[in-house]
Amino acid sequence: EGKKPGSTIDRIVSFIDMPKTWLSLTGAKVTENFQGRIFLGHDTEPESRYHFSWRERADERFDNVRVMRDEQFAYHKNYAPFAPNGQYLAYMHNMKATGAWEKYHQAGKTTAVTGRFFRPRPSEEFYDNFKDFHNIDNQIDDPLHQSKIKELKKELRRQQLKYFDSGLIPEEMRNRIIREKKTTVYAFVRDPKLYPLAKYLDYADLALERKKKNL
């Protein structure tokens, strides 16, 4: 209402905001089990302070990443830092541009920025989206940002526990346990005996520190 075609709204919008918003705009009932915030129309809700993003796959490849951001800053946690963003994907590598780019990288012609796509990732990343929209300058070690990094890391863990992040064990291991226990993913991640998530998060943090003393 009151928005012209092509206009924009100045707030963070998540995918989980969309079903709730579309139902609201059509006058349909929005039940309490819907997550997200309505961002258009008569029933617009206050913007969420934080935005949670995740990824467990990149098409046929395993790629485990979590992101917590607010309006300006974004904290990335790479649970599989050994896998580059540019790991082999059949669809992507079928494109001539990808092949040419990779050959250029293998020939040692890319820079620290243009070749990063094909290199292993750091365990953690932190970006200022106002100054660095494309997330190129990783400031995870900048002393000036440690307070904000701590805040976003704390919020990430809180939401992982609240929403039962199911990606802390391999997908096939999860499926095997579900078959053996004759249960569902929904029930499995809510059973601390089968899936002690807090411990798994702690173990993952130790591994991501990449320190010999943690072995």
Residue ranges and their predicted role:
Residues 22-30, 43, 47, 72, ...:
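A generic secondary-structure signal for well-formed alpha-helical elements
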Residues 17, 21-24, 34, 38, ...:
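Extracytoplasmic/secreted proteins, especially bacterial periplasmic and envelope-associated proteins
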Residues 108-124, 131, 139-215:
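Long, internal low-complexity/basic segments
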Residues 2-15:
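A short, structured beta-strand-centered segment in the mid-to-C-terminal lobe
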Residues 3-6, 134-138:
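Short small-residue beta-strand/loop micro-motif enriched in glycine and branched aliphatics
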Residues 1, 18-23, 125-132:
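Beta-strand elements within well-structured catalytic alpha/beta cores of enzymes
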Residues 11, 26-125:
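C-terminal cap/loop subdomain of S1 sulfatases and analogous C-terminal strand-loop tails that border
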